[in-house]
Amino acid sequence: MYRPSKNFVRRFLSLPIIFLGLSLEALEISFAGTEKFLTVSIANNDQLRRKGLMHTDDLKQNTGMLFLWQTSGQRCMWMKDTSLSLSVAYLSGEGAIQEIYAMEPYSEESVCSVSPARMALEVKEGWFAENGIGVGNTIIFK
């Protein structure tokens, strides 16, 4: 008889909680086929997505923010009131990275996804390249 692992069950039971807009302070994600991980803050409602990383002066090593939407669509990010240089990855509903862009501090110019995205992941600029993470890599919720 097949029994899913506890990690599998926990991971998939947590997804509805995340997408329903219930607040979670931080969540650990990893990237399939790698040993790379991030601890991310979750922005899963309009208020949290609007605030994003505004007024954040520093990001610790291997941290970021994961923006979640209920449906896939064109997503746009900006850097208003954000002093950090960031990279943003737009991800599919399955968690696959589709596009990665560098973001200029304090820029109010929108950087939009070309492909429909259900998630966006912001990290320190250069984190993706430094860790060998790119288009096609998939996140895993731990």
List each model region and its residues.
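A general, composition-driven signal for non-globular sequence regions
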Residues: 4-5, 19, 43, 93
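Hydrophobic h-region of N-terminal signal peptides that target proteins for export
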Residues: 15-25
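Bacterial N-terminal signal peptides that target proteins for export
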Residues: 2-16
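Compact, glycine-rich, soluble single-domain proteins
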Residues: 24-142
